[in-house]
């Protein structure tokens, strides 16, 4: 682990070393840092110091560490850093379930295993794709800003649905959900793009959640309460249906 912290290969704790900062964070950090310098120049120390710490916090929030992606075609990797807050059997949302206007199939309306990953404000908030393939669907839905850890947040909050499809027919749907503090989902990809497994596909600002829908016949390889790392932690392996103790909630 010590080497990971030094070379910043992204094995969970490596996120706390000093990785690259995403451009979204640089502009916010620069503004807050500039405000801190101005207030310090004016000798307003009671304001300058909090602003300086806030600038560091903004940069830490938007840190963007590299990740070691597993070379396993069956692997479905975590799209987000955070904690598995819920594993449940649910029907996919209509945006992912139904066929699109061109007749391309969705996930269907049969219940699938959904793994919900909650990202606190201390987690890396860059999201990554769970598999390689084509972004066959990307749908943004405006909504509320409830606590992202609540189950109903998946139906009522601002969210963005993505469907990644492989030539062999495998489709993985996942949803970025804005939270109580998060107020904007920022996409890095568009519909039709070809993506690699673990590729950066977007971010959600300041605390949020990502739901992943596993294909039928595939059991989760994680349990509720487990910490996961985007692009590295294997949530499941396609076709493997052995349930882990504690994975059924």
UniProtKB/Swiss-Prot annotation:
GO terms for biological process: phosphatidylethanolamine biosynthetic process. The keyword Membrane applies. It is found in: Cell membrane. Is synthesized initially as an inactive proenzyme. Formation of the active enzyme involves a self-maturation process in which the active site pyruvoyl group is generated from an internal serine residue via an autocatalytic post-translational modification. Two non-identical subunits are generated from the proenzyme in this reaction, and the pyruvate is formed at the N-terminus of the alpha chain, which is derived from the carboxyl end of the proenzyme. Heterodimer of a large membrane-associated beta subunit and a small pyruvoyl-containing alpha subunit. The lineage of its organism: Bacteria, Pseudomonadati, Pseudomonadota, Alphaproteobacteria, Sphingomonadales. Belongs to the phosphatidylserine decarboxylase family. PSD-A subfamily. HAMAP family: PS_decarb_PSD_A. Its cofactor is pyruvate. It is a peripheral membrane protein. This is Phosphatidylserine decarboxylase proenzyme. Pathway: Phospholipid metabolism; phosphatidylethanolamine biosynthesis; phosphatidylethanolamine from CDP-diacylglycerol: step 2/2. Disulfide bonds: none annotated. The record marks 207-208 as: Cleavage (non-hydrolytic). The modification Pyruvic acid (Ser) is found at residue 208. The active site is at 208 (schiff-base intermediate with substrate). Its EC number is 4.1.1.65. It catalyses: a 1,2-diacyl-sn-glycero-3-phospho-L-serine + H(+) = a 1,2-diacyl-sn-glycero-3-phosphoethanolamine + CO2. GO terms for molecular function: phosphatidylserine decarboxylase activity.
